[in-house]
Structures are given as C-alpha cells and as structure tokens.
Design a protein with these regions (language model features):
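Short, hinge-like loop/turn segments at secondary-structure boundaries
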Residues: 50-54, 107-108, 131-132
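Short, structured motif recognition centered on aromatic/hydrophobic residues
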Residues: 6-7, 33-35, 73, 112-116, ...
Length: 150
C-alpha cells in the first residue's frame, strides 16, 4: 500500500519525530523511505544607491555550504537507521520547502508523506507560515502528520 514514503526534514528534533513511524510503515509494507532536506536560499539583494549587496560568489559559497551540511545531515540519519531493514534514500534540494516537498512527492510517485508539525501558532505562524498546511493543500496524496508533543 505505502511502498514509497517521503519524509521531509529541516534538521530539527521535532522534524525527526516523523522518522520512526515512516520507517515502521515502510518496513510493514515492504517499501522505501526518501529523506528530503530542502535548503532555503537567502534572498539576493538588489543593489541600491549607498548599499552594496553581497557578492554572488559569497551567496553561491553559502548555498553550497548549506547543501553540503544538509547532505552530511541526511547521511548521518541514513547511518543511524541503517539497521532498520528499510531502503533509505536521501535528497537535498534548494527552494521553497512546501513546493519542493510537493514536487518530489509527485515526481517520485510517492504513496505517503510523513512529516512533523512544529506547533507554531499566533505571530510565529503568521511570520513563518505552516509548511505542513501548504503541503496538505498542494499534495494530492495521503499525509501523516506527527504532532509536536505538548
């Protein structure tokens, strides 16, 4: 039933709470798990009189560094869960998290997305939005949300 499960991660402990249920489901159904880390590029400033934007080479170097850190993070998780008896794949992309999650889910024929909520509310939710909510609206497939412990 669920043979390809996508687990989006942001590097936080709450996000990693989705790993165990995803791996258990994949093992039960004989499936695989795709670990996804989306690196959010910093906005590039346009030069205005009296202001100097960061040079593009600095921007590119920072993005490369963030991608390398994300790859190392996912490699560590794959190593940690190596003995779970499930095929684990890792993917690092750059972009808007919700859009990239939906794109990967569609492009890789994912059967289920398992992700954690961060429990943001009020001003934090207004400022940062809800990736989980955007994925719910954009992905047309089953999604298992793991709530943040209260």
């Amino acid at each position: 039933m669920f043979t390809r499960i996508l687990v989006p991660l942001d590097g936080s402990a709450p996000a990693e709470r989705a790993l165990e249920p995803a791996i258990r489901l994949a093992k039960h159904f004989g499936g695989e798990v795709i670990l996804l880390r989306v690196v959010v590029p910093e906005p590039v400033l346009v030069a205005l009189p009296g202001l100097s934007p960061r040079p593009y080479d600095v921007y590119d170097a920072e993005l490369r560094r963030d991608q390398e850190e994300a790859e190392a993070y996912l490699s560590g998780l794959k190593l940690q869960w190596h003995g779970a008896g499930v095929a684990l794949h890792a993917e690092v992309l750059s972009g808007t998290p919700a859009e990239m999650i939906v794109d990967v889910a569609q492009g890789r024929a994912v059967d289920l997305i398992v992700m954690s909520t961060h429990g943001r509310s009020g001003v934090n939710r207004l400022l940062y939005g809800s990736v989980a909510e955007a994925v719910l609206r954009g992905a047309h497939l089953p999604i298992l949300l793991i709530p943040l412990d209260q």
